[in-house]
A protein has these predicted regions:
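Beta-strand/loop-rich accessory regions of lumenal/periplasmic or secreted enzymes
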Residues: 1-146
Length: 147
């Protein structure tokens, strides 16, 4: 039997992808477009899904030239993204999005060395803005995020 102690366990939910290893468990939501649970050594580190932010603190110069008025759409832009596309890669191979009933073809004992999930998110700005967020996880629980 293959040694699964140094592998990443993949759990295919109806609307989520779970990744579990020694001392960690992560859950990614297809409907929310991001990570919704980051549990390390029994401690939960997220209380809601991760969201992008496109705003920064205003400076005196910003206030003087009306920046806050012209750019106010960006203050709330990251709050309600629309999930346009989701791609799941298991060991660098793209698979069909494993939502019901496709996820039923997988067992609850899938072990891999790495997984990646990419979310293409659209923000309601003028013009529309799209951002691709990629989460790559290895068997040690290390997460590499690319935006």
């Amino acid at each position: 039997m293959e040694n699964t102690a140094t592998k990443l366990r993949v759990i295919y939910g109806d609307c989520t992808l779970g990744l579990k290893g020694k001392g960690f468990h992560y859950i990614f939501s297809y409907t929310r477009g991001g990570m919704e649970s980051l549990n390390k050594n029994g401690k939960e580190w997220l209380y809601r899904e991760t969201l992008s932010t496109f705003w920064r603190a205003l400076t005196d110069n910003d206030r003087g030239n009306g920046f806050e008025y012209r750019s106010s759409v960006w203050l709330g832009a990251g709050k309600y993204p629309k999930v346009k596309q989701i791609q799941v890669k298991i060991e660098d191979t793209a698979i069909e999005l494993p939502i019901a009933p496709v996820n039923n073809q997988y067992s609850n004992t899938e072990y891999v060395s790495s997984a990646e999930i990419l979310f293409t998110l659209e923000y309601n700005t003028v013009p529309k803005t799209e951002v691709v967020v990629s989460y790559r996880i290895n068997a040690l629980g290390e997460i590499k995020v690319n935006v």
